[in-house]
Every structure is written in C-alpha cells, then in structure tokens.
Amino acid sequence: FAPQIIKNCMISIDGLAVEFGGTALFSDISFVINEKDRIALMGKNGAGKSTLLKILAGARQPTRGKVSAPKDCVVAYLPQHLMTEDGRTVFGETAQAFSHLHEMEAQIEKLNKELETRTDYESDSYMALIEEVSSLSEKFYSIDATNYEEDVEKALLGLGFTRGDFQRQTSDFSGGWRMRIELAKLLLQKPDVLLLDEPTNHLDIESIQWLEDFLINNGKAVIVISHDRKFVDNITT
C-alpha cells in the first residue's frame, strides 16, 4: 500500500541510446511518464523493449542519455524470468510485500522509547527526533495496513491460486506459478510506476482479466511489454 501523500512522480527519459559493439539497439529515445499513464512497448523480438525496461528500473545503464525521477518515486519491476525464494508458504511469501510496514513500525517504537528517556526538551536534537517520529508515524498511519491479509488473499485468488494453496510451500509450484507470486507481491506494494515484462505469459484468461481490472483501477503508472494485443488494448485505452 502506498502512502496517501500527494506527490508528482513524473519520470523524464532523455536521449536514451544503447549500443553493442558499435551497433545501435536503439537511439535518441525521449519521452515522459506521467502519473497514471498506462503505456505499452510493442515491437519485434530483439528491438530493445526489455533493455529499455531494465534501464527504467535502474537495473542497467544506457550507452547515452539519462532517466530523471523524483527521489521519492517508487518504481517496481517484474522481469520476464524470475524465481521466488524457497522456505515460505505461498501466503507468507506474498505477504513479504508488506515487510516494510513491520520495519517502519519497529522504527517508530524504537524512536518513541528514545524520546521517553530524553530530558533535553529544548535541544535541536530532541526537536529533530520529534519531527522524525511525527513524519514516520504520519506515513505509517496513512497506509491502510489493517487489512493486508485480506489484500494478499484477494491478489492470490485473482491470480488463480486457491485457498488450499495458501499454506503450501512455494517450492511445490512451477516457475509460472511462482511468477504469479512475484506479480502479486509487486501489485500489493502499489509502487508509483509498475514495469511489467510479459506479465500475461503464465496467466489464464480469468487471471488476465483480473490483472487488467487491477491495473486500470490502481491509479498508478504502468509500462508493459506484451505480445497479447487484447490485454494491451484493454489496459491502455
């Protein structure tokens, strides 16, 4: 869940170029990603779509050009090939999407305990600590974390899992099903910009329809690579 804090997460792409051994994969690509934009990258295999997505995710550097985004802009990336970690249940692994909330809560508790032991009420450091607790608490309570288990359940059911699957180990599932777990985690984090590389590859029709509805109603920017023309048409129009 993203904090309900108003911010402008516009990303500017300026003059991107990627070359391999003097051969240009693409050059002089410039565009802007605005809040709530839903953009599809389409083209033949080898055109550089996945490479562009990796650059936007910060996973690789271009030969030339730059990507500019606000510091607090959260970008999440689902690559085409990815494996989930073993050692957790399907539900437990998906709930890792909210692990930052537990860390935030622990930090607030730690700072509050420190405040209780301080007596230098007029000092700059005390005021700075008060400000830090206030800011962190505001951010934490602006996130509706109370129903996160319900949201995990909805995402897993939407992506084709059954309730009987929730307590099974992730290692019981094939790569395609494990990719669904990673997709669920990414969606539940509600980043400002979602980068999805062929997200429908391992999904059935019902799960694709659920994903379409989620992306349309999510209200966040999405950039997707997909050969599924119907999916692209549905989410970008």
Can you say where each PLM-predicted feature lies in the sequence?
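ABC ATP-binding cassette signature C-motif
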Residues: 3-237
